[in-house]
Amino acid sequence: MSASAVYVLDLKGKVLICRNYRGDVDMSEVEHFMPILMEKEEEGMLSPILAHGGVRFMWIKHNNLYLVATSKKNACVSLVFSFLYKVVQVFSEYFKELEEESIRDNFVIIYELLDELMDFGYPQTTDSKILQEYITQEGHKLETGAPRPPATVTNAVSWRSEGIKYRKNEVFLDVIEAVNLLVSANGNVLRSEIVGSIKMRVFLSGMPELRLGLNDKVLFDNTGRGKSKSVELEDVKFHQCVRLSRFENDRTISFIPPDGEFELMSYRLNTHVKPLIWIESVIEKHSHSRIEYMVKAKSQFKRRSTANNVEIHIPVPNDADSPKFKTTVGSVKWVPENSEIVWSIKSFPGGKEYLMRAHFGLPSVEAEDKEGKPPISVKFEIPYFTTSGIQVRYLKIIEKSGYQALPWVRYITQNGDYQLRTQ
């Protein structure tokens, strides 16, 4: 069982718009939602599911709005929450910003969307590209020439319309990897993983089939134990367009892509990652009157690669003042509102080492800090490089008209949650 009704409320709990799907819950029940929420908040016992009598309120907050679903039955809670977040996504794609004003300005479209998104309490069409075939930005049905059913009715490929045409046929594919890293104050790597995704922008005419081949090193977690130099991907998720049966048979990623931008696949690699940018810091406090920092940054990737827009965020005491900086490269900025200094290096080639010194005055005499010190965090982006070693071997584009298309492939490695603790 799913939702009985869905409401959008303002911050005071006033109903802006609602839709009754099953008729088994009194629509006035939502009046109890805000008092219960405030009571639980005061008690410090706030939860995403609230109850009044036999009615359950499942809710999320977005900007200055509450999205609430009610149910009297034994609802599938994860499905309801997934649906509420999907509603936020669809509304945001239609109105750019989902807030009270956009709700008030678009009542007609929202009612139409709510009718398509859910039927009798069960989620139905939640893909915004499909919805845009039924419901235009002005809230009217599409009418181009003679009336015709939407492409999704006649077409087995629901995520792509027929009759798409481009003067120039192109495909852009980005392999993006984010490195999550946590290093102890002693220099030991406590946690390291790679979170990757393959994102595409497709501008192709007709109904093309694409075939993507990755390098032989890449294995997927259900293929068994691989060779020592293989890349075993975990938590692999594909876009709905990928033919999973073919992938399970011969590991070919074959698909008819949606038009425009989408994420083809995502993956995770839980492995020991050599820190791409290594930070060593020496912090000296002198009689509570001043504090000195010596920070060394070293790039530990191949010399032919370069990290761009590197930012090293170094925490400093709240009461520090009178900053003085000296660095071999880049620039240093004190950000007092964040209690940190930011060392910025626009271009950081592989195999290089740079030094930065900072000096602060400490006007107040306080006892030694007993709380843990915040870690140093690093931001960076390395183009033409993947930490995992994943590579696109080929990207074939097959379309019955036989046109030539240009595939463009790009690799980017960037920081995720990248932190190094200090002594």
Curated annotation (Swiss-Prot):
Belongs to the adaptor complexes medium subunit family. GO terms for biological process: endosome to melanosome transport; intracellular protein transport; melanosome organization; vesicle-mediated transport. InterPro entries: Adaptor_comp_med_subunit (IPR050431), AP2_Mu_C_sf (IPR036168), AP_mu_sigma_su (IPR022775), Clathrin_mu (IPR001392), Clathrin_mu_CS (IPR018240), Longin-like_dom_sf (IPR011012), MHD (IPR028565). GO terms for cellular component: clathrin adaptor complex; clathrin-coated vesicle; clathrin-coated vesicle membrane; Golgi apparatus; synapse. The modification Phosphothreonine is found at T152, T154, T223. CDD domains: AP-1_Mu1A_Cterm, AP1_Mu_N. This is AP-1 complex subunit mu-1. Its main location: membrane. One of its GO terms (molecular function) is clathrin adaptor activity. It is found in: Cytoplasmic vesicle, Clathrin-coated vesicle membrane; Golgi apparatus. It comes from the Eukaryota. The gene is Ap1m1. It is a peripheral membrane protein. Residues 168-421 form the MHD domain. Keywords: Acetylation, Cytoplasmic vesicle, Golgi apparatus, Membrane, Phosphoprotein, Protein transport, Transport. The modification N-acetylserine is found at S2. Adaptor protein complex 1 (AP-1) is a heterotetramer composed of two large adaptins (gamma-type subunit AP1G1 and beta-type subunit AP1B1), a medium adaptin (mu-type subunit AP1M1 or AP1M2) and a small adaptin (sigma-type subunit AP1S1 or AP1S2 or AP1S3). Interacts with MARCHF11. Phosphorylation of membrane-bound AP1M1/AP1M2 increases its affinity for sorting signals.
